[in-house]
């Protein structure tokens, strides 16, 4: 079936070491050991980007611009090219040629396809050693301390998405001046949040939430 072609399961349990304590954590095979499906990832990312668009950009063409009902000058005898309205796009104050108009950009993606995209990206990150787990994230509201934490774990300069079950205010304050770091909640992260980075850094609570969200409670 389609599901069996896209997903591969292994009997052996996957484990990953914590960066800060070297403790082993078990990863669910049905979340972190899934064969890559680029089409599912592509469709999900495009849908998220499309659905984020307002689609309200608008301009007025010659028929929408107010005024211009009077013929600017007589048809013949002036030597000018004939005109029937002063709101022609050729005139100052006229309409816009081929300007933007409101559009509906919404793109639907099936739930199973989107779930598969999440699992594919997480599995790919684990496979390429771009998925790091820590027991706890920095709790001091100091950027200096946060940078030290990144340096200590050899993460400085990499585009990082930090995932946790709850975004702590102190962590938010410490990281908001670091341009290559973004914070997201495990319960609401998007496909693009996981995809658009060099590395995912996640704490234990975030790992549990992700496993439940995409792999079920068992």
Residue ranges and their predicted role:
Residues 62-98:
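Glycine/serine-rich anion-binding loops at beta->alpha junctions
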Residues 2-3, 91:
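Short linear sequence motifs
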Residues 2, 8-50, 54, 100-218:
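Extended polybasic, low-complexity segments that bind anionic RNA or targeting/receptor surfaces
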Residues 56-62:
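Short coil/turn segments at secondary-structure boundaries
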Residues 3-4, 82:
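Intrinsically disordered, low-complexity regions enriched in polar/acidic and amide residues
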